[in-house]
Structure formats: structure tokens, C-alpha cells
């Protein structure tokens, strides 16, 4: 009985703090912490979340990030569906100062012929220093039971130098305004077991400068993004989850990737194609498909096996290359009744074929699911 009371006390906590430990080839070991708070605003069925996290790596890389989703509503509107006029505020803001690696893009000729093995070994990269601040705000307004449409804004300030290749004399500033639409029938925001989620956004972005001939400088770039997920309940308390994600940065002219490199869509990372170096593959377009089978283990613990495939593409010179494949296993621990999980994943990819080298693996310890 005492064990049950202790466990119930744990999963009813309105907030939590956990250590964050990640390992990936681009950063080696990262150590930090994440704190999250969970609450329901008045007359709301869904749980709002606010998160603060940060890490410091053995390569003297650091970042701090704040993000969250707040659910608001006006159930006294008299509408048949009490959530019909609800709206939500999604935000993400942060700053990072980290040595990074410039690997180029597919339009760079020395990366065009990769072959089927050792893609990561061919991409040795050039170290560079990057300071980056960002702010993203979205405010979808409920227009039906499951649909929401609203404005969005995005701002990025970056300063960086790529040794012997490029240096920003002044910070590069990007500001974007657009619209976001989403469809959501998930039974739970943090750990869904059934339902669909679809979000698409389109924005016009202005950049402070680009390195192309005078008179051809575009004033506007197009930023497009799509995120489609499905969650399927299976027998034996299994859940099959899959996601297709695409990001595009398009412009009328052939912009130097040295200028806009930190802004380009990228593949990989702890919430993307796990196991793939998140600095290695960037270009105008990113597309990825991943799936995950989630299964019970014991008490608050669940497991997962996952795999995904994706790549980046040059909008001006589309071509086929060897797809990047990431795969791995993980374990989750549910820490409250909102179904927020502590997640530990181990992943690798076909980018580095070595099985006996730790640099071919990525480790992620964090909160919430990848998707």
C-alpha cells in the first residue's frame, strides 16, 4: 500500500526537473537540466506546459531554451462546442553560443558523390563559431472542433564565421510573418495513443542581407513547413506512431549558402531523424519519415523501437542521393498523469557504418516524446 501511495504522489506532481544528458558526434557529451510545469487554465480540458532547458557540452557549446503551449478558451460563448472559440499560444525562444561544423550542402561539388558507405567520414567539415538567438510565436484560433488557424511570427539573429570562407561583419537578421493551420484529434498531447495531428505553415521572411549581386537581391524568402502524425492503438496495449515532416526555404534567386547557412532546414536531432548528426545535412528542403512502436514494460515504464528515413535537397538543382536512415531503441518513464515521459533513446544511422565506435551512436535523455 505504501508503494502505491508513493507512486501516486509522484505522478501527480504539477512540475518536474530532470537532468539532461545527450551524446552525439557533433557535440560529444552534453550535460544540463530541464524543468517543466503543467497546469490547466480556467475552463480548459487540455493541459498547458511551460518548459525551460539548457545544456553545456565538452566542446564548450551551450544553449538555453524556453518553450511552451498555453490553452485558452471561452466556454461561455454559447456555441454548441465549448472549445470552438478556444485558442492556444505556442512559443519558443532561446540563445546558443556554440562551436559548430560547416559541412556544406548538396550544391557543393565536393559532397556530391557520397557513395553508399561512410557518408559521415567523407564529410569532415570546417569548424566555425555561431551565436544564435531565436523567437517563434504561433497563435492558432479554434475554428471548429478539431481545426485551428492563426498568425505566426519568427525571428532569428545570427552571427558566425567559417574559417577561411565567410564571416558576418554584422549580425544576420531574419524576420518572418505568416499563417499556421492545424488539425488535432489526439487523445493526449504528450503521449497520444490514437488520433491525427497535422500542422502546416507558410511565411514570408525578410533577411537583412544576402551575398548575391546587387540588383538581384530578393527582399522576401518563402518559409514552408508541414508536420503530419498518426497514432494507432493496437492489441496488447501497443501504440504505432508515425510522422512525416517537411521544411522548405525557397527564394527566387540562387542565394549563397554561406550567407544563410544557419537558417537552412536540417536533418536529424533528438526530435527529428534520431541518430543523424543534426549539423551535417542542410539545404533548401528537408523531408523525413519516421515511425515508432511503443510498448509496455512494467508499471510506469514503456519501451520503443523506432526507425526513420529522410534527406535534404537543393531546390535549384534537385537530384537523388542515398537516403539517410536512422534507427534505435528507447525507454520511457511516465512521471505524471498528464502522461509526460522521461525519455532515453539510443540511435545510430547509415551515415557512419562503424559498429564498434561510440561516435557512430547518439544518446538522448530528455523529457517528452520526439513526436
What do the predicted segments below correspond to?
Residues 5-8, 36-43, 69-80, 137-145, ...:
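Outer-membrane beta-barrel proteins
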Residues 321-322, 339:
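C-terminal soluble interaction/assembly domains
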Residues 7-17, 21-173, 267, 280, ...:
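Gram-negative/organellar outer-membrane beta-barrel architecture
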Residues 165-166, 212-216, 316-320, 354-357:
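Short, solvent-exposed loop/turn segments at secondary-structure boundaries
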Residues 15, 31-33, 62-66, 131-137, ...:
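Hydrophobic, lipid-facing positions within transmembrane beta-strands of outer-membrane proteins
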Residues 311-315, 350-352:
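Short, solvent-exposed loop/turn segments at secondary-structure junctions
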Residues 177-182, 186-298, 303-309, 313:
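C-terminal outer-membrane beta-barrel translocator/porin domains of Gram-negative envelope proteins
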Amino acid at each position: 500500500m505504501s508503494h502505491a501511495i508513493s507512486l501516486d504522489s509522484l505522478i501527480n506532481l504539477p512540475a518536474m526537473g530532470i537532468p539532461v544528458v545527450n551524446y552525439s558526434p557533433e557535440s560529444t557529451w552534453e550535460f544540463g537540466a530541464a524543468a517543466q510545469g503543467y497546469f490547466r487554465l480556467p475552463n480548459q480540458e487540455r493541459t498547458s506546459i511551460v518548459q525551460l532547458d539548457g545544456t553545456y557540452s565538452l566542446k564548450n557549446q551551450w544553449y538555453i531554451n524556453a518553450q511552451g503551449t498555453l490553452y485558452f478558451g471561452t466556454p461561455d460563448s454559447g456555441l454548441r462546442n465549448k472549445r470552438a472559440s478556444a485558442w492556444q499560444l505556442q512559443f519558443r525562444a532561446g540563445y546558443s553560443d556554440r562551436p559548430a561544423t560547416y559541412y556544406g550542402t548538396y550544391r557543393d561539388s565536393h559532397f556530391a558523390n557520397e557513395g553508399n558507405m561512410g557518408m559521415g567520414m567523407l564529410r569532415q567539415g570546417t569548424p566555425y563559431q555561431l551565436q544564435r538567438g531565436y523567437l517563434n510565436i504561433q497563435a492558432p484560433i479554434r475554428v471548429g472542433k478539431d481545426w485551428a488557424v492563426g498568425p505566426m511570427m519568427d525571428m532569428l539573429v545570427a552571427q558566425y564565421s567559417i574559417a577561411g570562407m565567410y564571416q558576418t561583419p554584422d549580425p544576420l537578421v531574419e524576420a518572418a510573418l505568416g499563417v499556421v493551420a492545424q488539425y488535432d484529434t489526439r487523445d493526449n498531447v504528450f503521449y497520444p495513443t490514437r488520433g491525427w495531428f497535422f500542422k502546416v505553415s507558410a511565411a514570408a521572411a525578410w533577411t537583412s542581407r544576402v551575398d548575391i549581386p546587387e540588383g538581384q537581391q530578393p527582399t522576401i524568402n518563402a518559409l514552408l513547413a508541414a508536420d503530419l502524425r498518426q497514432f494507432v492503438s493496437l492489441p496488447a496495449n501497443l501504440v504505432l506512431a508515425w510522422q512525416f515532416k517537411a521544411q522548405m526555404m525557397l527564394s527566387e534567386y540562387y542565394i549563397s549558402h554561406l550567407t544563410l547557412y544557419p537558417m537552412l532546414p536540417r536533418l536529424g536531432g533528438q526530435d527529428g531523424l534520431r541518430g543523424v548528426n543534426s549539423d551535417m545535412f542542410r539545404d533548401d528542403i528537408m523531408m523525413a519519415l519516421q515511425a515508432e512502436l511503443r510498448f509496455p514494460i512494467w508499471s510506469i515504464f514503456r519501451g520503443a523501437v523506432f526507425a526513420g528515413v529522410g534527406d535534404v535537397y537543393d531546390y535549384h538543382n534537385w537530384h537523388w542521393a542515398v537516403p539517410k536512415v536512422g534507427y534505435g531503441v528507447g525507454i520511457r518513464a511516465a512521471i505524471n498523469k498528464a502522461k509526460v515521459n522521461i525519455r532515453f533513446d539510443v540511435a545510430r544511422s547509415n551515415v557512419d557504418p562503424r559498429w564498434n565506435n561510440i561516435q557512430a551512436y547518439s544518446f538522448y535523455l530528455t523529457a517528452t516524446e520526439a513526436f
